[in-house]
Each structure stands twice: as structure tokens, then as C-alpha cells.
Swiss-Prot record:
It holds the Pfam family tRNA-synt_2c. GO terms for biological process: alanyl-tRNA aminoacylation. Catalyzes the attachment of alanine to tRNA(Ala) in a two-step reaction: alanine is first activated by ATP to form Ala-AMP and then transferred to the acceptor end of tRNA(Ala). Also edits incorrectly charged Ser-tRNA(Ala) and Gly-tRNA(Ala) via its editing domain. The gene is alaS. This is Alanine--tRNA ligase. Belongs to the class-II aminoacyl-tRNA synthetase family. The keyword Acyltransferase does not apply.
């Protein structure tokens, strides 16, 4: 067998199938941007479904790939077993209605056994097949020459996920020898059994049947091939190492962790070995996932990353690593993978920043959290229970950042379990509290009263019209049906046809009026009713509104005009953020009103001033290019193929609304927009801030609001210039001149203060007392700040040569205290840090420092004299 690196095996696989006429499909992003319902790409075939289900016809029906994948269903087993991983690479070859069973088997055998390729000893290979797959048996036995005793028939060799394509599969196993198992009485010691000797190398799936709704199977008109070979497992066999972690795909990370920790891998400590493995696995996953745009958070795929990082940090403590360090492994992962995934090294600085940020956040609470958990476990044992309550588990999650799964691992080590149901109950209570705290949401009490019973149809026509003739089809007051609303009364109603947009997708509702003969009704707000209709919150200003009344519904066009400008601007902003900051940026929330827009997005660290300037300029350039905004209805799959941005967690129907701004922005959106970007006029960023870990917020204005903002700023500039007696264009020069003047005055002030301090220090020497043979000076002085206090202290120590000195000053009801001890007295046991702490405690403060100099603060100026009197007592206590 050849000596090969993991990178060489990957490339060899792709080269082999390229020679067999396959197109090499690039590895897709781990984050399935085209399918927000899917958490991660979790297999080689996941990105090829569009070919297998016929939505897209591939240019070449023969495809091969090396697909990075993430699976997180067995996180707790990572590190415990030889081959469990959260991140792995799946090598595969696929046929979309082209070749079938014979070619798939023949090529697999050639790749594994030919000296040109892997070069396995044929005698060490066995295969499993489905008991009824005689075709596969014949190919293996007669054409490949595998003796029948090494062809094992297993019932589970059938790939079936319910209705749809299915078929038998064959798996190829490699015999690693008696060192990995020689107990032939073991019922699992066979290819396909649970053992370490016979390792599965390759799985070939023959998709030849359709599983029908009635449970029957019928032959497919076009048969497909879907194969999978785990690179990590294959590499462990080729490199003849006991586990996947001992291959060159993992050892560089383990080696770097050895250097950081000072501990050794495989040094006889199984617990430490597990820690090395957990860290190596999890940093690969996090590095690739962040590189593909995922960021740690408290939900979805972000929660998975947070859980992995915090699990790795927890295990790092077993290696005596008590500081953020995982970020240092990011470039190591990049070096290992650079041949096939150069993007990791290209993004290493950003990835490392994200990882370090998350590590630092967890380290801030980890120690306290572990202490609390230890108390919880001890208390549970005292109470003779083996269950950690959901309340305690939630407190660890909410206050100390412990993912529930991490608490469960700690509990398992202590022989305990966690009340998962109780934890979920606490989570739901928190969600309820959050919902109740949102005063601006559900203010209409949409769910109240009879609204859930209303099933009448209501059509929204507001995309294309601002006024329409309508009929009131439901009228509600105080949660109950009513026949009428009088002047001054508030209620809720539904129209059979409405131009009023209901608040959703971050866009606020339309306002406007309903008009009829003698009737004028103000529409204050519009929300979605429980059954999906637009529900109008109204106040009758004139006349009486009755159920079934015919009205003219007219929206406030001035308000709508401002809203649509801001909404289209958020789409331009979203894309500009991706262009400037990176593709990891994703929308995390938005608010679109007539006055302003607010856009929340995933990003670590403050957006720098020059970046904000670039973002703002890009948005304005797109506005000034006068780009048409096209809105269309598309099948969801077609929209995804077009590359439309979809929001993770959003539920989309089969047909979606696509908003396209030229070739610049493409999003799925149900909101209202301008027809052309020129209508926006101008875009101005007002503020950028952080609203949580990994989430930033930009607030901006457009159109008239942007003009008014800039006009106000120009007005302030003119006012400031007037006060400085200069022109606006010269104001910076004038400010620089003023700063220079202030700096000169500060220097003169400091010089004067130093002279005064020197004079006062000279006067203070007359107040020196001798206590047990030690010069002692404790005095309240009149200086402006701690810097002047230090200057005075230095003067006094120089003048006195041998002394214990304590000075205190009072400014704005705050006490500054400074203690100094000359070198000769330090050796006798006098300590400025200890002394100043005692003095400060007597006037409501605290502090400390070095033996020769220490400072403190106090809160009670009235007690300063009393505090200074303690200095003599201190000197006496030391001299004894």
C-alpha cells in the first residue's frame, strides 16, 4: 500500500473519476444558502439533489465531488470513539441516469486495488450486499474475483427513506488485521459488524426502484448511482493508524494543542487524549462553518457553533488551558486544508477573530458557572436525587452561557441527568416574558375575542393600488362582534379588498382613511389576523360605521412613499454590507418606517468608519444609477436557483415574491418597494452599534429625512463657525488652533501646579512627626487630581529621604488618597499598599498597590481627617 497524505487521497479520487468521464463538482458551502430550512450540508449527495430529482439537468450525467459536511447528531460521542466527527469530507461518484451497477463496482475495485491508485491488497477486502441482489453478487464474484465467502449478504443493505427512489447497496470493507480483533467467538467480528477490525471503506447505492405510496416497489425508468467514501476513515487505513484522529488531517491541530498546553497526546491518559480529539474535531468544524458564513448565536446553526466552541473550551481545561486559545488553531486548519480549500487561509483573520470573541465571552462566565454547577450537583447529592432541575440548568444557560448539552455532559460525569422538560419550560417562560415586554407588538391584541373565528376572505391589493372600493366584512369592538362603531369609538375590521399593508417583514403598516357618505374612519394600524386576513385598527372620526358598509379605502400615500424608499434601501444596504464586510453578513432583523430604517445583521466587531463610508457610498451609487426594481412571482426552487437571498428560519410557500434591483440585489420579500432606485433620492447612515454578541445594527434615513438631517448638520457647522469667528470651510484649522492653545495652557497649568506643589511640599515638611523612630507625614492637601498628588509625593520622599507619607485631597466630594514608603523602610515591613487600603476603608473607599507607592479612593470627605489619624497607629503596629 502506498504512503499517501489525506490531501493526496482526495485528489487521487477526483483524478480517477475525472479520467472515467466525470465532471468534478466543487465542494458547496456548508451553509445551504439556497435552502434556509436545512441547517447544514450533511452529505456528498445533499448538494446534488437538484440533479437527482430532475429540477436541473446536469451538463454531464457523471459527477464526482469531495464535499465538506457537518453532522451534529452525535456530538457527545466525538472524542470518545475512533471515528465520530462533526466535520468530515465525503468523496463520491454519481451517475444521473447514465452508468449503473457494473461500472460502479468495477471502478470502485480498480481505484482501491490498482497499483496506479490506492493499491490495497485484494485479499484484505470484503463486501456486503443485499440478500436478493444477485446482480451485485455476480459482478463481485465472477468479474471482480471476490470469493463468495468474502461476500456477505445483509438485510440492512437497502437504501430507503420512504416514498421515492430507493435501492440496494453494497459496502466495501478493509481488514486491518488481528491487532484490531482476533476473538472469533465475537458475534460482531465480521465485515458489517460492530468492530474495529473490518472498516467500511466505501458505500455504493444502486437507486433502481421507486418506493410507491402503497408500499410497493417498481423499477425506475432511469437508474442512478450514489456512492460515498469518508476521507478521514480512508486516510486512517492508508496511513495505518488506529483512529482517524491519528491521521495527518488531525495531528497538526493536536500537535499545536500539545505546544499550547504542555501536555502530550497518547501519553497514557485517556481523558486527556479525549480532550485533544474534541478540540481537533471542533476547531475544524467551527473554522469551516464560520468561513462559510455561519456565526455563533443562540439559535439554529449559530447555536451549534456556540455549543461546539464551548464544549472544546470545557475540555481544554483538562489540558490545563485556562485562556482563549482555539483561535490560534484556525491557521493550522487552514494549512492542513489549503490545497483544496484555500479560502480558509484567505479568511483566517476573520475566522480567528470570531472564535476568539466567542472564547473570551465564555471564559468570562465559565469559572462562575462551574462553581454554581458544582454547588447544584453537591446539593442534589445531599438531597439524594440524581436529577439536576430544569430551573438550575436554565440558570446555567441564561446567566453563564452553558448550553444545555454541556450541562448534561457535566451531569453525566457526576452520574446524574438533567430535567430537560423542566429546562424547556423555563425557556418558554422566558420567551413569554420577552413577548410581554414588546409593547409595540401585539398592541392590538390580535388574538383576542372572536378574531380567531373569523374566516371571511380578505384580498390585499396594495402592491399596485393606493385606493379601492371595499366592503366591511367583519367589525369587532372589545373582542366581540358589533354591528356599528360610533364617533370616537375604536374597533377592528376586515375589508373584502384592501390596499392597506399589514405590518410584516419589518415593514410597518399603512395608515389612511375609510370614507363613505357622512363617514370618515381613521386607519391607525394594520396587523395580520389569526387566520391571515389584514386586520385594520380604526377610530371613527365622523358618522357611524356599520358592518357591511361600502367604503373607499385610501392609504396615506405620503407615508407609503417614505416607507417604500426605506424598504428598498434596506435591500441595497444588505448587499452593500456583504460587499464590504464579507459574505458572512446575514440579516438578523429590520424595521422600516416612514421616518427611518433599522437593519440588524450578523458581524463581529464594530464596523469601522471607513467601512461605513464605503457602504454608504455604494448604496448611494446604486440610487444614482436609477436602477429599475423588478418584482415577480417565482416557484421557490426557481427563486433559489436564481440566487435569491432567503432568511434562515423564515417559512416560504411554493410560490414566492422576488424583489430584484437590477443585477445588484435579489431577495425574497413580501414588502412594498419603489419602482426605481432614483426615487430614494439619498441614503445617509445615522448610527452603527452593537445589540448583542455577533449582531450589529445600522440606522439610516433616506429622501426628505436624509436631506433634513444633513441640513441640520450644516446648520450646526455654520453656528459653530460663527461662534469661532471663522468660515465653515476654515473651521478645522480654527479647531486645531484652539487645541494647540489649550495644550499650551495645560502645560503652563501643570508647570504652575508643580511649583505650587513643591512649595506646599516644602511647607508640609514642618508637619513631619516621629513615631517610634520613623518619620511620618499624614496630611490633607489642596491639589486638583491624582497626578498632582503623585508629583507632591515624589517631592516629599526626596526631601525627607526616609519616611512614611500619606496624602489626601478632596475634589467634587471624592477623596483621592496616596501612600508612599521610602526604600529603607520597606525592608522593615512597611507597605504602602496595605497602608492605603486601611486608610481608604475609614472614609468609605478602597484601594491598594506596591510597597513603595499605592493609591486609593474614598466616598466620605468628612472622615478624611479621622482616616489620616490612623497612619500613626499603623506605624506603631509595624514597629512592634
Amino acid at each position: 500500500m502506498k504512503q499517501l497524505t489525506g490531501a493526496q487521497i482526495r485528489q487521487m479520487f477526483l483524478d480517477f473519476f475525472q479520467e472515467k468521464g466525470h465532471a468534478v463538482e466543487p465542494s458547496a458551502s456548508l451553509v445551504p444558502h439556497e435552502d434556509p430550512s436545512l441547517l447544514w450540508i450533511n452529505s456528498g449527495v445533499a448538494t446534488l439533489k437538484k440533479y437527482f430529482d430532475g429540477r436541473v439537468i446536469p451538463q454531464n450525467p457523471r459527477i464526482t465531488n469531495a464535499q465538506k459536511s457537518i453532522r451534529t447528531n452525535d456530538i457527545e460521542n466525538v472524542g470518545k470513539t475512533a471515528r465520530h466527527h462533526t466535520f468530515f469530507e465525503m468523496l463520491g461518484n454519481f451517475s444521473i441516469g447514465d452508468y449503473f451497477k457494473e461500472e460502479a463496482i468495477t471502478w470502485a475495485w480498480e481505484f482501491l486495488t490498482s497499483d496506479k491508485w490506492i493499491g490495497f491488497d485484494k485479499e484484505l477486502l470484503s463486501v456486503t450486499i443485499h440478500p436478493e441482489d444477485e446482480e451485485a453478487f455476480t459482478i463481485w464474484n465472477e468479474k471482480m474475483g471476490v470469493p463468495k465467502e468474502r461476500i456477505i449478504r445483509l438485510e440492512e443493505n437497502f437504501w430507503d427513506i420512504g416514498e421515492g427512489p430507493s435501492g440496494p447497496n453494497t459496502e466495501i470493507f478493509y481488514d486491518r488485521g488481528e491487532a484490531y480483533g482476533n476473538d472469533f467467538s465475537d458475534p460482531e467480528l465480521y465485515p458489517g459488524g460492530e468492530n474495529e477490525r473490518y472498516l467500511e471503506v466505501w458505500n455504493l447505492v444502486f437507486s433502481q426502484f421507486n418506493h410507491n405510496p402503497d408500499g410497493s416497489y417498481t423499477p425506475l425508468p432511469k437508474k442512478n448511482i450514489d456512492t460515498g467514501m469518508g476521507l478521514e476513515r480512508m486516510t486512517s487505513i492508508v496511513q495505518d493508524v488506529p483512529t482517524n484522529f491519528d491521521t495527518d488531517l488531525f495531528m497538526p491541530m493536536i500537535g499545536a494543542t500539545e505546544t499550547i498546553s504542555g501536555e502530550k497526546y497518547r501519553n497514557g491518559d485517556l481523558e486527556k487524549d479525549m480532550a485533544f480529539k474534541v478540540i481537533a474535531d471542533h476547531i475544524r468544524t467551527v473554522t469551516f462553518a464560520v468561513g462559510d458564513g455561519a456565526l455563533p448565536s443562540n439559535e439554529g446553526r449559530g447555536y451549534v457553533l456556540r455549543r461546539l466552541l464551548r464544549r472544546a473550551v470545557r475540555y481544554s481545561k483538562k489540558l490545563n488551558i485556562n485562556r482563549p486559545f482555539m483561535f490560534e488553531l484556525v491557521p493550522v486548519v487552514g494549512e492542513v486544508m489549503k490545497d483544496f480549500y484555500p479560502e480558509v487561509l484567505e479568511k483566517k483573520d476573520f475566522i480567528a477573530k470570531v472564535v476568539k470573541n466567542e472564547e473570551e465571552r465564555f471564559h468570562e462566565t465559565l469559572h462562575d458557572g462551574e462553581a454554581i454547577l458544582a454547588e447544584v450537583i453537591a446539593k442534589a447529592k445531599e438531597e439524594k436525587t440524581t436529577v439536576i432541575s430544569g430551573v438550575d440548568a436554565f440558570r446555567l444557560y441564561d446567566t453563564y452561557g452553558f448550553p444545555i448539552e454541556l450541562t448534561e455532559e457535566y451531569a453525566e460525569e457526576a452520574g446524574m441527568t438533567v430535567d430537560h422538560e423542566g429546562f424547556e419550560n423555563e425557556m418558554e417562560k422566558q420567551r413569554e416574558r420577552a413577548r410581554a415586554a414588546r409593547q409595540d407588538v401585539d398592541s392590538m391584541q390580535v388574538q383576542g375575542g372572536v378574531l380567531g373565528e373569523v374566516k371571511v376572505a380578505s384580498e390585499f391589493v396594495g402592491y399596485g393600488t393606493v385606493a379601492t372600493e371595499s366592503n366591511v366584512v367583519a367589525l369587532v369592538k372589545n373582542g366581540e362582534y358589533t354591528d356599528s362603531l360610533q364617533v370616537g369609538e375604536e374597533g377592528q375590521l376586515m375589508l373584502d379588498v384592501t390596499p392597506f399593508y399589514a405590518e410584516s417583514g419589518g415593514q410597518i403598516a399603512d395608515r389612511g382613511y375609510l370614507l363613505a357618505d357622512g363617514v370618515k374612519v381613521l386607519v391607525k394600524d394594520v396587523q395580520k389576523a389569526p387566520n391571515g386576513q389584514n386586520l385594520h385598527q380604526v377610530v371613527v372620526e365622523e358618522g357611524t360605521l356599520t358592518k357591511d358598509a361600502a367604503v373607499k379605502a385610501i392609504i396615506d400615500t405620503k407615508n407609503r412613499s417614505s416607507v417604500v424608499k426605506n424598504h428598498t434601501a434596506t435591500h441595497l444596504l444588505h448587499q452593500a454590507l456583504k460587499d464590504v464586510l464579507g459574505t458572512h453578513v446575514n440579516q438578523a432583523g429590520s424595521l422600516v418606517t416612514s421616518e427611518r430604517l433599522r437593519f440588524d445583521f450578523s458581524h463581529f466587531g464594530q464596523v469601522q468608519a471607513d467601512e461605513l463610508e464605503k457602504i454608504e457610498r455604494i448604496v448611494n451609487e446604486k440610487i444614482w444609477e436609477s436602477i429599475d426594481v423588478e418584482i415577480s412571482q417565482k416557484a421557490i426552487e426557481e427563486a433559489k436557483e436564481m440566487g435569491a437571498m432567503a432568511l434562515f428560519g423564515e417559512k416560504y410557500g411554493d410560490v414566492v415574491r422576488v424583489v430584484q434591483v437590477g443585477d445588484y440585489s435579489l431577495e425574497l420579500c413580501g414588502g412594498c418597494h419603489v419602482d426605481n432606485t432614483a426615487s430614494i433620492g439619498i441614503f445617509k447612515i445615522v448610527a452603527e452599534s452593537g445589540i448583542g454578541a455577533g449582531t450589529r445594527r445600522i440606522e439610516a434615513v433616506t429622501g426628505k429625512s436624509a436631506y433634513e438631517l444633513m441640513n441640520d448638520q450644516v446648520g450646526l457647522l455654520k453656528e459653530a463657525a460663527g461662534k469661532m469667528k471663522t468660515n465653515p470651510k476654515d473651521i478645522l484649522t480654527r479647531v486645531d488652533g484652539l487645541f494647540a492653545e489649550v495644550k499650551q495652557l495645560q502645560k503652563e497649568n501643570e508647570s504652575l501646579a508643580a511649583k505650587l506643589s513643591n512649595i506646599e511640599a516644602g511647607n508640609l515638611t514642618d508637619s513631619v512627626m516621629t513615631v517610634d523612630g520613623v518619620n511620618v507625614l499624614a496630611a490633607k492637601v489642596n491639589v486638583a487630581d491624582m497626578n498632582n498628588l503623585r508629583t507632591m509625593m515624589d517631592d516629599l520622599k526626596n526631601k525627607l529621604e526616609s519616611a512614611v507619607v500619606v496624602l489626601a485631597s478632596v475634589n467634587d466630594d471624592k477623596v483621592n488618597i496616596l501612600a508612599g514608603v521610602t526604600k529603607d523602610l520597606i525592608s522593615q515591613g512597611y507597605h504602602a499598599g496595605k497602608l492605603v487600603k486601611e486608610v481608604a476603608s475609614r472614609c468609605g473607599g478602597g484601594g491598594g498597590g506596591r510597597p513603595d507607592m499605592a493609591q486609593a479612593g474614598g466616598k466620605n470627605p468628612a472622615q478624611v481627617e479621622e482616616a489620616l489619624a490612623f497612619v500613626q497607629e499603623y506605624v506603631k503596629s509595624v514597629s512592634k
